[in-house]
Amino acid sequence: MEHLISLFVRSIFVDNMIFAFFLGMCSYLAVSKNVKTAVGLGIAVTFVLVVTLPVNYFLQTKVLAANAIIEGVDLSFLSFILFIAVIAGIVQLVEMVVERFSPSLYASLGIFLPLIAVNCAIMGASLFMQQRINVGESDPKYIGDVWDAISYALGSGIGWLLAIVGLAAIREKMAYSDVPDALKGLGITFITVGLMAMAFMCFSGLNI
């Protein structure tokens, strides 16, 4: 249980997908103009992470790993293709659910909802998980079973959600601020993201 909590907290604050690895920046910048829309996308990304990582963990350990199916056969070269296929399938399911039950959110997210399928934060989480399976049990980042994968996925999703909602809240306030003309738009947004990332750097020294 302690290891699960450690993985969860680390993935939110220490190994935040946005502020530590800058993954998923395209949709992060494009959909962070409104808090409501940002919350919707953040929840969708979190859901996709929580569903895809356990599936990809199973594929990695039971199918792709060396000697997993047949002695002497290593299918790890197929990991990119299979991971992307799983992510795309789950995203398609999420898109259909959102369109059915929340048409306004579906319209607000626009093209960025199906683009979750190529959101590098989700693919990055699967690849980080793939690496962490092999680091050894003594490493705090170790992912040794499906529950570790779920904990890491949930933390990564919540970390991404916090990042996009935080930026959206700031950008809503900045819309009424006297921003210099040269910095309006993405200029002041990049500065804001940089300051937020620097703030999250204070967590990097935590020994969790």
Predicted regions and their residues:
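Cytoplasmic-side transmembrane-helix entry/capping segments in multi-pass membrane proteins
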Residues: T37-F47, L78-F83, L105-I116, A182-I188
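Juxtamembrane transmembrane-helix termini in multi-pass membrane transport proteins
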Residues: S6-F47
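Structural signature of hydrophobic alpha-helical transmembrane segments
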Residues: S6-F19, V73-I87, I150-A163
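Generic transmembrane alpha-helix signature in multi-pass membrane proteins
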Residues: F22-A30, E95-F101, F112-L113, C120-D139
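C-terminal ends of transmembrane helices
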Residues: L23-T37, V91-L105, L167-D178
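Interfacial loop-to-transmembrane junctions
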Residues: E172-F190
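Hydrophobic core segments of alpha-helical transmembrane domains in multi-pass membrane transport
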Residues: L23-S27, V45-V51, I84-L93, V118-A125, ...
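Ordered, amphipathic secondary-structure segments that act as subunit-interaction surfaces
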Residues: T61-L109
